[in-house]
């Protein structure tokens, strides 16, 4: 990965390079917000003291627009948008080099989706990280992507800059982005 033979690294060395925002947030319901954010900071090669981990958690929560007053709350006490922000804070807690975003706006209303997309774009640029996003949300694609790859049946059907997406001339891309039932992607009726 990025010129490093992963077979010659430890599991911790490999994982410390990555952050992940899961589709459903994947927050631990038995852990407070700050402990969710600090999950990777409390184990492995990046282990920090409890106080330092909490301090970093609060800093990352602030970065995603949440105040320290939610640090001791539990995920069930938060709205869906707040949970997504906590998940984003956890994804950046270790200052990773690469972040994966799996359907980052799933379950959010259009306004919160826009807020999360803006946060993702800002954070990726600010941290200078590589980001890979898996999404079917074309609003997210247009808001956060630089390069786009269209996958269908396990194959890349098209790859190119976001600016060329609507003029790709690719029938798979066109069917998907315009949401038509006619085209090479089989639909059920």
Q: What are these model-derived regions, one by one?
A:
Residues 95:
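Conserved catalytic motifs of ABC-family nucleotide-binding domains
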Residues 99-102:
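Catalytic Walker B motif of ABC-type/P-loop ATPase nucleotide-binding domains
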Residues 1-13:
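ABC ATPase NBD Q-loop/coupling interface
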Residues 50-69:
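Conserved ABC ATPase "signature" region
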Residues 74-78, 82:
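Conserved ABC ATPase signature
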Residues 31-39:
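Short coil-to-helix segment of the ABC ATPase nucleotide-binding domain corresponding to the Q-loop/switch region
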């Amino acid at each position: 990965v990025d010129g490093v033979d992963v077979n010659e690294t430890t599991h911790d060395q490999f994982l410390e390079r990555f952050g992940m925002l899961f589709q459903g947030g994947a927050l631990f319901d038995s852990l407070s917000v700050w402990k969710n954010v600090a999950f990777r900071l409390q184990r492995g090669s990046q282990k920090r003291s409890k106080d330092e981990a909490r301090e970093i958690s609060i800093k990352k929560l602030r970065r995603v627009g949440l105040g320290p007053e939610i640090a001791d709350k539990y995920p069930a006490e938060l709205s869906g948008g707040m949970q997504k922000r906590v998940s984003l804070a956890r994804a950046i807690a270790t200052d990773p080099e690469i972040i994966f975003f799996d359907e980052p706006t799933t379950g959010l209303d259009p306004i919160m989706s826009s807020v999360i997309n803006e946060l993702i774009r800002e954070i990726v640029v600010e941290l200078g990280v590589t980001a890979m996003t898996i999404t079917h949300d074309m609003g997210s694609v247009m808001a956060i992507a630089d390069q786009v790859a269209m996958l269908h049946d396990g194959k890349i059907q098209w790859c190119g800059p976001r600016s060329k997406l609507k003029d790709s001339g690719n029938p798979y891309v066109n069917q998907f982005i315009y949401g038509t039932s006619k085209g090479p992607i089989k639909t059920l009726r």
